[in-house]
Amino acid sequence: MQRSLSMSGKRHFIFAVSFVISTVCLTFSPANAAQKLSCTLVIDEASGDLLHREGSCDKAFAPMSTFKLPLAIMGYDADILLDATTPRWDYKPEFNGYKSQQKPTDPTIWLKDSIVWYSQELTRRLGESRFSDYVQRFDYGNKDVSGDPGKHNGLTHAWLASSLKISPEEQVRFLRRFLRGELPVSEDALEMTKAVVPHFEAGDWDVQGKTGTGSLSDAKGGKAPIGWFIGWATRDDRRVVFARLTVGARKGEQPAGPAARDEFLNTLPALSENF
């Protein structure tokens, strides 16, 4: 849980101010990408009460592949996505996808294997107007789908280390609205989206969630990994909503998103003893 620190004296004041400035710079300035930041946030789905908060949870970053969840809602609501296995789209060379993603993909595979080109083909079929309208109506993050300055690529790249940003606090608020049927879409769209979000186990919790992996560039050309894991966990009749974010963590064998996922799954059973 977060702790409040009592500070007195000039040195403590200077240290506190410096810390705040450096944290803000990490959010808005790639030059400080080497610094580390993390957040683990858990709220009760029914009441919205805070259950656990640790780290800097109000700083906004690109959602990366966690944005596939709202994209799925849009796709089902717009009748572009029809069920868990329809449509199944073939890969095309012009998609410029990673080699591992150059395969026929349906909504279940899309979420499970985090297929970037499927997201982009979905937004192309939505079109700029409908895509932007959904983001605005969802009140998702900063709602900026303009993309990279001067590139006019928001339709296919806004969520990929570009203009669209969201904080862990905003992620859990959005997810709670989704789970409670408070988004301005059809009930079928909500239920079909829930059906394709991957399942994981964490002790006696059934967890559904989506990872996201990206990076911040620093002034020297270095990269600081960004890892997301967002979703909900159910045990008996209790459901909680969570967001886990890491920025600048040491690179390991796993990409940052799956690493954030495994960290959360490993710690949830112990965390939930205090829920």
From Swiss-Prot:
The protein's annotated catalytic reaction(s) are:
a beta-lactam + H2O = a substituted beta-amino acid
GO biological process terms, alphabetically, are: antibiotic catabolic process; cell wall organization; response to antibiotic
Q: Does the keyword Signal apply?
A: yes
InterPro entries recorded for this chain? Bact_Transpept/Beta-Lactamase, Beta-lactam/transpept-like, Beta-lactam_class-D_AS, PCN-bd_Tpept
Q: Does the keyword Repeat apply?
A: no
| Organism whose genome encodes this protein | Pseudomonas aeruginosa
- What is the protein's name according to its record? Beta-lactamase OXA-18
The catalytic site is made up of S65
According to the UniProt record, what class of enzyme is this? Answer: hydrolase
